[in-house]
């Protein structure tokens, strides 16, 4: 079953500022992207071409022409944002690749160029310090006619990207690794991770990019002969890359309107923390139709939608417990007027504005808006006055 975006949801998605686009003003993300692109231009001594494409794409370009199977879970409306049976908001910047490959069909001679496809992608995602519903990505594809590209080229591409994102001069001792990874549009696919130190001192591997050799079927579907054409493909999340480079621990800061924070997002210097307002927590007891609805990505997406322009106040949404009717005390079932198949979900909201203090009353009103959007039960428990 497909859930299509309403016109309001679509307009609000399309109105969101793309931080990779200089047309809306300077942002650190553009500087980081420029560093990565120029590093690869130097590595290979080839020109680059940047494509800023409409985020509304043919579903076939987002999935089928990149080799995704018809039953792939990522197609589900629970995770992707469909506008109609054949059109969606792209879930990755790779959606622009099939049309790009089509445009190369007439190239007869030598060809070697880096294609850069940056922009917003649209997901339904969890709410926490590292996830938003519309993150930024870039696809970096080197396409070459009359020449081979192999795993050694991919390895040097990964090394150049790591050095561009986390230059050794500022990040001495940076460690990275690549592990095998399967993508429908690459062969010899790799996942690129960097080792980061968390605020509590622990080390953790974080994914920076996914990459691989361009798969022959993807070339073939655009009429390019894989015996003549070869390619390297790398996709990177730019929000995470900027956060790693600048030492930012909350993804919401990248869009902050707070002048103290905003001024620090014009360069790639290390972020100097600005004291944030205290976090306010609100716990909700929801009745949902079944346990499949108790999905942190699904609930996070609905909560963001309910809050609209206030969504940036929601720092985290956590599921604390999921209990079927049969396991609840009869008094609770009675009070909530639950049906046999229902589940009770205890949900915690963490509300923390980046630029103002939240009164209890304001927090209660935000809590109620989320509650009304998520709760499926017969009895409502609202707390705002």
Please name every model-derived segment.
Residues 1-131, 142-143, 205-219, 228-230, ...:
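Class II aminoacyl-tRNA synthetase-like tRNA-binding/catalytic domains
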Residues 19-25, 138-152, 282-292, 359:
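Short histidine-centered catalytic/ligand-binding loop motif
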Residues 29-44, 140, 153-169, 298-302:
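Amphipathic alpha-helical segments
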Residues 40-46, 109-111, 164-174, 305-317, ...:
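Short secondary-structure junctions
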Residues 45-61, 172-183, 315-318:
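Long, charged, glycine-rich C-terminal linkers/tails
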Residues 84, 133-137, 187:
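Short, solvent-exposed loop/turn segments at the edges of secondary structure
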Residues 151-155, 160-190:
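Extended C-terminal subregions enriched in glycine
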Residues 179-200, 206-385:
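A carboxyl-terminal module marker
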